[in-house]
């Protein structure tokens, strides 16, 4: 895996409050190597280790993107939903930013069926077929389409399982993480001081509740993805 310089600035991370962990009483002892100190009953994350992990993750996604692999970004907590959609769209990644439907990956054949239904309904809407149906039936199909758009819109172009997943909150996305582990899909995940870093391939110690913190981490990762894709197209 190639190593590059990603301009990860500790002061910028401080300003984004990446270093702020949870209350000390909520901590997971496995996060001890990533904790710098505690202040007012709150754990403070060691940003030097955050920078090291983030740089490693950027190197990985850069290489994978350069090989044309597919990414899935997951973040359904309210602080992350808009950030995930924006970052994933910019980097041409698949994403889930609403409810994670159980079995979305482990029961891929069912997901494929749902995606085909989504595609068919969208085509019917775009061609005006809904307008030719009785109002009650058209309304029912429109509701189905809206639901599919809400939960599957971010993966509508996903034709197979992703090659790697980026997860913004380990505890909130435990089902998604579990499915990735079951299938052997590599994971990059923000881990706050109440998380278990052993559950992911590349843990990035960081505040997983703050919008600025999530945005900074996602921006660095998706920038690396975009650079990898650009290099591949040369």
UniProtKB/Swiss-Prot annotation:
Pfam families: Ribosomal_S2
Superkingdom: Eukaryota
UniProtKB keywords: Chloroplast, Plastid, Ribonucleoprotein, Ribosomal protein
Subcellular location: Plastid, Chloroplast
PANTHER family reported in the protein's UniProt record: 30S RIBOSOMAL PROTEIN S2 PROKARYOTIC AND ORGANELLAR, SMALL RIBOSOMAL SUBUNIT PROTEIN US2M
HAMAP family (UniProt xref): Ribosomal_uS2_B (MF_00291_B)
The protein's name in its UniProt record: Small ribosomal subunit protein uS2c
Organism name: Pinus koraiensis (Korean pine)
